[in-house]
Amino acid sequence: MRRPDRTIRKRLKSLELHLKEENPILVSAVGGFRQLSRVGYAMGLLDTSESYATQIPWWPLISVLGTFSSGKSTFINQYLSYPLQDTGNQAVDDKFTVICYGGDKDARTLPGLALDADPRFPFYQTSDELDKVESGQGRRIDAYLQLKTCDSDELKGRILIDSPGFDADEQRSATLRLTNHIIDLSDLVLVFFDARHPEPGAMSDTLAHLVGATKDRADSSKFLYILNQIDTTAREDNPEEVVGAWQRALAREGLTAGRFYTIYDPEAAVPIENEALRRRFEWKRDQDLSEILSRIEQVSVERAYRIIGALEKRARDIEEHYVPKLRELIARWRRQVLIWDAGWVLLGGSAAAASRFLPPAMAANVDNGLAQLFASPLVMMGTAVVLVMGALYLHFRVRRWAAAKVVQEIKQEHVDEEAETLTRAFKRNTHMLRSVFCPDPVGWSWRNRRALKIIVSSANQLVQNLNDRFTDPSGKRPVVEEVDESESPKAISGEVVPREETV
């Protein structure tokens, strides 16, 4: 049985020790991922240097995406009450910034290597993925990523990711790939747009990437679309028209559900002379901001459900997606092998039949040669061995050729990690000792089928355990005393503590 290497075992043990203190329910989820990985190793879906547990983030993760000058960095600074990110009307940062809590009073900026080499953070081993997009980009990891720490209580227990200003027309393929990566990892995605641009139709390519790819996702509820700097519409008093224009732009990309949150920075807001109008804008801003902050506070809870959901999804994917796909690939390979084998047999039979139509003199020589061959058992046996070895050589050459052809088709039909996974698993089914007539993939035994059923059942039980923590349908649970208001989630006032002051 294939086992994970020592590094993976050590990482999972460390993760379990951390979760015992932070969220004991998720310790069982680590065990489920460990068992699921064993199935992946057996089928070739996973390399022994990998684990399904390391392919998802275990920290609550919030990503902030948006167009240039949409106020992403300003929002983060306000949320942290610290001017961590540089702000401006133009693109001021072209890197993905992972922001986490740090005990030092002064904020620190660490290079991309800090993320690429540490499995506790997102973007672990991202340099390898960048090399797949464009050779040599992995060495330039510091040009794409950076890690910042900040002594802000809002960062305790969660990680923020600030993305560079987005423009699909000019964005490099590596940056687009990183954007898709953080979208997949995140528990909450805040997508910022700039209300100062009244013609969202001109940004159709950007909307297509930021919005179009989300409408069919099972986790589409984790996306919040935020129309920032809505105060600029106060002069014409037309916020509804601006919001409507952006909603129509989203609808053109296929997103008909959902809503826009409209906010602005009170410190940099356009002066609104009309008292009633200012109060209306402030009320709407406070309402939407409160909802956004509430969703951020819920991320820790959503994280637990997301991890357990990922466990069940991976287990179902193996049985419902990878097994049928591998069966199809094996059948495709078998078909090509048998066609070529039949061709060699027909070619040999045709040659034997053609020998009967040779001129009489040549036919007599062939008959004499065969008579001498069958007259000596030793020579006959040696000839048979040579023929069998030749047939086996041709058969295994055909197997390798057919396997290489199927691998090439996999790379054409699938992209990136999916192609790599299918290729690795398919190759395990084409080794020399495996018959071409085996319909099921390597590792798809009754034991592993049973293991997947147990994993799915355990995941459902973990969801019930989480529900027991957060719900009480019968109403019999003792009422918990109300938390003091000073401990409740804060509202962003717009005031940012200067860099020089202690946070």
Predicted regions and their residues:
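Charged, low-complexity cytosol-facing tails and large interhelical loops of integral membrane proteins
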Residues: 167, 178, 420-503
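Conserved C-terminal guanine-recognition region of P-loop GTPase G domains, centered on the G4
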Residues: 121-159, 167-254
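Canonical P-loop GTPase G-domain recognition
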Residues: 219-224, 229-303
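Cytosolic-side membrane-insertion boundary helix
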Residues: 302-348
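Conserved G1/Walker A P-loop phosphate-binding module
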Residues: 2-142, 152-153, 158
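Cytosolic/nucleoplasmic, non-transmembrane interface domains of endomembrane
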Residues: 12, 16, 66-72, 92, ...
